[in-house]
Design a protein with these regions (language model features):
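Intrinsically disordered, low-complexity regulatory segments enriched in Ser/Thr/Pro
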Residues: 1, 47-117, 178-181, 186-191
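Aromatic-residue detector
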Residues: 22, 88-91, 123-125
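Surface-exposed beta-loop interaction hotspot
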Residues: 95-154
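Negatively charged, low-complexity tracts enriched in Asp/Glu with abundant Ser/Thr
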Residues: 1-63, 132-185
Length: 191
C-alpha cells in the first residue's frame, strides 16, 4: 500500500499548476470493478497500462478540467519519487474506436512544478490533438462547453517554441480525398 496522502498532495499541487482549471480528486480502486473501469478508459498503451496491470494501487489521483479532459495520476513503479500522468478516453467515447489516436502518458518528476510543466508541454498538446482528430471523425462529441475556439487552440498548441515565436495555425479542411488523374497528360490534379 502506498502513501495516499502524498499522492493526494501531489495531484492537488499539479492541478493548481496546469493551465486552466483542473479539479483534483482521489479515486478508490481497491475493488477490482473500479480498477477495471479506470483501466478500460485509460488512453495509454505504454507504461501506465503496465503499471495499472502489474502493481497494486488502492487509490489513483484524478484530474478533470472544464472541457471534460481527464488525467489519471499514479506513483511510478520501481522509481521512487516519480509519477505517471496519463489521459483517459473522454466519457461517452468508445475506447476501441480511438485506440489508434492514443496520446500516451508521461513519466514525471516528483516535483509538482516540473510535473505540471512536463504535462503542459508534452501531454496536453498530444491529448488536444487526439481529441480534435476524434471529433473530426465523429467519434467524440467535443467538450461540453465548446466556445468555438477549441479547434484553433488545439491546432496551435505549442510544445517547445522559443519565447516570442508565433505558432503556425493549421485549420482542418476535412478528410483527404485521393488524387484524380487528369486524362491524357500523365498529371495528377490536386483535390
Amino acid at each position: 500500500m502506498r502513501d495516499n496522502r502524498a499522492l493526494e498532495a501531489f495531484t492537488d499541487q499539479v492541478a493548481r499548476r496546469l493551465p486552466g482549471t483542473w479539479e483534483p480528486m482521489l479515486a478508490d480502486v481497491s475493488r477490482s470493478a473500479a480498477l477495471t473501469e479506470v483501466y478500460e478508459q485509460l488512453w495509454d498503451l505504454g507504461i501506465t497500462q503496465w503499471a495499472l496491470l502489474e502493481f497494486v494501487n488502492d487509490r489513483l489521483g484524478m484530474l478533470r478540467d472544464s472541457q471534460g479532459r481527464e488525467l489519471v495520476v499514479l506513483p511510478r513503479p520501481l522509481r521512487p519519487g516519480r509519477y505517471l500522468i496519463a489521459p483517459l478516453v473522454p466519457t461517452g467515447t468508445d475506447p476501441g474506436t480511438v485506440e489508434d489516436l492514443t496520446p500516451f502518458g508521461v513519466s514525471v518528476s516528483g516535483s509538482p512544478a516540473r510535473a505540471a510543466e512536463t504535462a503542459r508541454r508534452r501531454l496536453l498538446p498530444r491529448l488536444d490533438y487526439a481529441l480534435l482528430l476524434a471529433e473530426e471523425r465523429g467519434l467524440y462529441p467535443g467538450p461540453p462547453a465548446d466556445d468555438g475556439h477549441r479547434r484553433v487552440r488545439a491546432a496551435t498548441a505549442r510544445t517547445s517554441l522559443p519565447t516570442g515565436t508565433a505558432p503556425a495555425v493549421v485549420f482542418s479542411a476535412g478528410p483527404l480525398r485521393p488524387a484524380t488523374p487528369h486524362s491524357g497528360r500523365g498529371r495528377v490534379l490536386a483535390p
